[in-house]
Amino acid sequence: MTNLRKTHPLMKIINSSFIDLPAPSNISSWWNFGSLLGVCLIVQILTGLFLAMHYTSDTMTAFSSVTHICRDVNYGWLIRYLHANGASMFFICLFLHVGRGLYYGSYMFLETWNIGVLLLFAVMATAFMGYVLPWGQMSFWGATVITNLLSAIPYIGSDLVEWIWGGFSVDKATLTRFFAFHFILPFIIAALAGVHLLFLHETGSNNPSGLCSDADKIPFHPYYTIKDILGVLLLILVLTSLVLFSPDLLGDPDNYTPANPLNTPPHIKPEWYFLFAYAILRSIPNKLGGVLALVLSILVLAVVPFLHTSKQRSMMFRPFSQCLFWILVADLLTLTWIGGQPVEHPFIIIGQLASILYFLLILVLMPITSLFENNLLKW
């Protein structure tokens, strides 16, 4: 009798995706982040669901409903901090996942890569709207500042902002719609992740060498299932340590003050995972230019496959490109640091130089270096 997992319509899909999937035999732990992102998404949806049961999306009661969750609901504090820090873990995994794709040339799978860029935008939008929901000072002012950026769009800008706000300022209508979108988007993200996986399985995974691995495949189960479980355990270890020992480490103290439209916080800044983009936004003195740079800081990823000039796919055997890649990582860390600093000397000029270097590395230096490496190898 044929195995049920190979004949049952539903089991067949699971089997071909997670059990009998032919996988390269040499993929390293950098390939674990896809499954970790899946786990993060599940954790976020579950904790978010339980938070939504107790949360009220009204400006008068939102802040106190979050306080109520933390104080009165059984393990409410745990659910709330798992959700807040789960977002941080989500972004850590996302950045490492994208970094892996850039380093090993996984962006050559065009459909998979472009859906990945779309997923990154969707997750960033979801996280931004989620940050508004507790209705603290940073929630309110963050929402005001970021939505206001749309007013830089010529002709329709101010109308667009008022349309998003549902009034003439960030108020009850804004909070209610942000809650609705924050609830629905993770399910759209889950669907997109399914499509992401579908396109990946059309081509098969890339591997560290960047070479075709068709001649040397192994089944996903048990080899990579056990490897993924180890990754998940480490993720849970880091997340629970963060939640139980220092849950507010990555948060902003200002968000423990209820939103007050009459009192602006001294330093308005987003969560740590947006600081690099925020630094790029602030480094351009023109409003529209800043908004364009902000969008392009992520959208530039979609251009990367077309700028691949090397004859080799992976950076594994390209030391000059490796140097530039790690300079890019250092540059992003610098931008993250600058995004959290006040707008004053010397932070302004550091931010501007780091922003220029960011685009210069991706759009100019890396493609030129790849051509130089081809030349060295007489290719």
Swiss-Prot record:
Topology term for the membrane: Multi-pass membrane protein
CDD domains the UniProt entry points to: cytochrome_b_C, Cytochrome_b_N
Cross-referenced SUPFAM superfamilies: a domain/subunit of cytochrome bc1 complex (Ubiquinol-cytochrome c reductase), Transmembrane di-heme cytochromes
Gene3D superfamilies given in the database record: Cytochrome Bc1 Complex, Chain C
Cofactor note: Binds 2 heme b groups non-covalently.
Residues reported in the UniProt entry to bind a ubiquinone: 201
Pfam hit, one: Cytochrome_B
Residues annotated as binding heme b b566: 97, 196
GO terms assigned for molecular function: metal ion binding; ubiquinol-cytochrome-c reductase activity
Extra remark: Heme 1 (or BL or b562) is low-potential and absorbs at about 562 nm, and heme 2 (or BH or b566) is high-potential and absorbs at about 566 nm.
Function: Component of the ubiquinol-cytochrome c reductase complex (complex III or cytochrome b-c1 complex) that is part of the mitochondrial respiratory chain. The b-c1 complex mediates electron transfer from ubiquinol to cytochrome c. Contributes to the generation of a proton gradient across the mitochondrial membrane that is then used for ATP synthesis.
UniProt-recorded name of the protein: Cytochrome b
Organism expressing this protein natively: Sorex haydeni
